[in-house]
Regions:
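Small cysteine-rich, disulfide-bonded extracellular modules of the LU/uPAR three-finger superfamily
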Residues: 1-108, 115-155
Length: 155
């Protein structure tokens, strides 16, 4: 089965329960924003809307890649500018750059997950054309943080 781009079903419930704290300021018991990570997955993995948390199953491995992925730069506050259909959106404040890596097995998916939460809850699953990398930096450029393009858009 293939990877499928999606917002994990549990993420919506996590939002209502106040589990994830995006942005630069936090309104809950702790005063620190959560730390998010991004992990890459093989094209043969099955990462989709039913993926509730980070898993090592199906994750890429290779020279220069650390299991669990990389830290996501999070200096962008979520926004809510109204609009038709989308009420809130958020995008990491920097591209996801996986240092000099060699990943010779085809991969096509990145999972963003909350590394602060005990369950490493999944935040988003994004797919792209299957690729491999040989001794190079693999970069996923983040979209503009706006109503139309935000990486995570909630209606």
């Amino acid at each position: 089965m293939a990877n499928t781009q999606a917002v994990p079903k549990t993420f919506r419930l996590d939002l209502l329960n106040g589990l994830h704290a995006f942005g630069t300021s936090v309104v809950r018991g702790t005063t620190a924003a959560d730390a998010f990570k991004a992990a890459l997955y093989l094209a043969t993995a099955t990462i989709n809307a039913d993926s509730t948390a980070y898993t090592a199953t199906g994750e890429v491995s290779g020279s220069g890649y650390t299991a669990g992925g990389i830290a996501v730069t999070n200096a962008t506050a979520p926004a809510n500018t109204g609009g038709t259909g989308v009420v809130a959106f958020w995008t990491p404040s920097a591209s996801l750059a996986f240092g000099t890596v060699t990943l010779s097995t085809s991969f096509d998916c990145v999972m963003l997950y909350n590394n602060t939460a005990a369950g490493k809850n999944a935040v988003s699953v994004n797919t792209f054309g299957a690729t491999t990398v040989t001794a190079a930096t693999f970069t996923l450029t983040m979209p503009t943080n706006d109503l139309t393009n935000g990486l995570i858009r909630i209606a």
